[in-house]
Amino acid sequence: MHKNGKFIPLLALGFTFFLSGCDYFADKHLVEEMKEQQKEQETKINLLEKQQKEQEAKINLLEKQQATIINTTKKVTEVVGRVERKQRLFDYTELDPSQTHYFIINNGNIGLAGRILSIEPIDNGSVIHLDLVNLLSIPVSNLAFNMTWGTKKPSEAKDLPRWKQLLLNTKMDSTIELLPGAWTNVTLTLKGVSPNNLKYLKIGIDMENVIFDSIQPINDTKKKPKK
């Protein structure tokens, strides 16, 4: 019994150690699970942060693209505006015939380039000899020109109304045919202003009777089918 009495405490102590060992291993396993879960959470957080950065990068890219589109649209609008303003300027040409030798008229339908050859005096007026060239790829016929002429245009705004009242104008009809790329001589007769005083000329195209084709008869060169 004595021996058995000693054995029982030893057995109890061993059992206690066994239970403590089980608790230790259970706690260690729990810690490992928690560490593993923590790693998984960190991985998920890192993935979310990466996705967030990717989304932010996409948003920044979209914002840059949008800004680029806006800037490009503004530039295109500005360019179109400048072209339209220049186009309106080319609807007619204003020049000092004593100083200008070359000019362009382009109203969107017809494009002409011109060069002034000479200005000669006539009774109560002037005659301008010039060449015109058709910038289109097809012949243009029956051109008419609206012309305004006079003395030098004043630089002061207060003098413009009186100057405009003294300007002369007329419409010059013609049956000339302007072939593509070919210079054609034209004579303008401007009454009322001598060559020494002729410092302003405005030329515009009248489209009323314009023909976009050759007015010269074309021989039929098609061969008749043999019977």
Curated annotation (Swiss-Prot):
Q: Which Gene3D superfamilies match?
A: Lipoprotein YajI-like
> What does this protein do, in the record's words?
Required for proper surface expression of the autotransporter adhesin SadA. Could be directly involved in the biogenesis of functionally active SadA.
Source species: Salmonella typhimurium (strain LT2 / SGSC1412 / ATCC 700720)
Q: What is the membrane topology here?
A: Lipid-anchor
Q: Which residues form a coiled coil?
A: 31-68
Q: Where is the lipid attached (N-palmitoyl cysteine)?
A: 22
Question: What's noted about domains in the record?
Answer: The homotrimer is held together by an extended N-terminal coiled coil, which leads into three separate globular C-terminal domains of beta-sandwich topology.
Secretion signal, residue range per the UniProt entry: 1-21
Enumerate the subcellular locations listed in this protein's record, separating them with semicolons.
Cell inner membrane
- Protein name (Swiss-Prot/TrEMBL): Inner membrane lipoprotein SadB
Q: Which InterPro entries match?
A: YajI-like_sf
Q: How does it assemble?
A: Homotrimer.
Q: Sorted alphabetically, which keywords does the UniProt record give?
A: Cell inner membrane, Cell membrane, Coiled coil, Lipoprotein, Membrane, Palmitate, Signal
| Entry GO terms, CC | plasma membrane
Q: Where is the lipid attached (S-diacylglycerol cysteine)?
A: 22
